[in-house]
A protein has these predicted regions:
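Conserved A3 ("GATE") glycine/threonine-rich loop of ANL adenylate-forming enzymes
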Residues: 1-11, 24-28, 128-130
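Short Gly/Ser/Thr- and Asp/Glu-enriched loop/turn motifs at secondary-structure junctions
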Residues: 1, 90, 126-130, 171-173, ...
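AMP-binding/adenylate-forming catalytic core of the ANL superfamily
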Residues: 47, 52-53, 76-167
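Conserved C-terminal "lid"/linker of ANL adenylate-forming enzymes
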Residues: 120-122, 160-188
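Ser/Thr-glycine-rich phosphate-binding loops at phosphate-binding pockets of nucleotides
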Residues: 1-3, 73, 97-98, 186-188
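Active-site loops of AMP-binding adenylate-forming
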Residues: 1-17, 57-60, 139
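Conserved ATP-binding/catalytic segment of the ANL
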Residues: 22-27, 36-97
Length: 189
């Protein structure tokens, strides 16, 4: 839909931690639709690198663009005062906390994925609004280290507590469940 780039940071300008950079000057524009009080909203773009539409799919094309021609990326993000873009998550994956707070599971997953022995993770919300982290351990690394299942469980619980210390109260992970294999990335036919 948009290629090859929307944003980047030239080497000589320096970067900002967590930022995707600035829109390509003179080529791309980025704005945030319906920002909340933190300035986070849907990232929309327009410019030379944006598609014109989906081939023979007028309904999909209509859904992909705003009425005034901006491409909906499906990302949630914000722009800082210097024009740097920060992606917070995906529109379809945002969760609502118990008091209506926005929870971006990708941000929590990024913290979990930096824990020792974690290959990948997925944060889900239960019916009671509690957050659960499904974690696929790096079993090759676990085996190489000689950890027992009990030691791995204990390590994951300690890591859950560490991650929670970095999160707001409404983002706390209640439980960690170990997953036996990598998560499916594409649907099977």
């Amino acid at each position: 839909e948009c290629a090859p780039l929307i944003t980047f940071t030239p080497y000589d300008e320096g970067s900002k931690l967590g930022s995707c950079g600035k829109p390509l000057e003179g080529i791309m524009e980025v704005k945030i639709l319906n920002p909340n009080e933190e300035g986070i909203g849907e990232v929309v773009v327009r410019g030379e690198n944006t598609m014109q539409g989906y081939y023979k799919k007028p309904d999909a094309t209509k859904d992909a663009f705003t009425e005034d021609g901006w491409l909906r990326t499906g990302d949630l993000g914000c722009l800082d005062s210097d024009g740097f873009l920060y992606i917070k998550g995906r529109c379809k994956t945002m969760l609502l906390g118990p008091s209506g707070q926005n929870i971006y599971p990708e941000e929590i997953e990024a913290k979990i994925n930096n824990m020792p022995f974690v290959l990948e993770s997925l944060v889900l919300q239960q019916e009671d609004n509690r957050l659960v982290a499904l974690i696929c351990p790096d079993y090759n690394e676990v085996d190489a280290s000689g950890l027992t299942r009990e030691q791995l469980d204990e390590l994951m619980e300690d890591s859950r507590k560490q991650v929670n210390s970095e999160l707001a109260a409404y983002e706390q992970i209640s439980i960690v469940k170990l997953y036996p294999h990598e998560f499916e990335k594409t649907p099977k036919k």
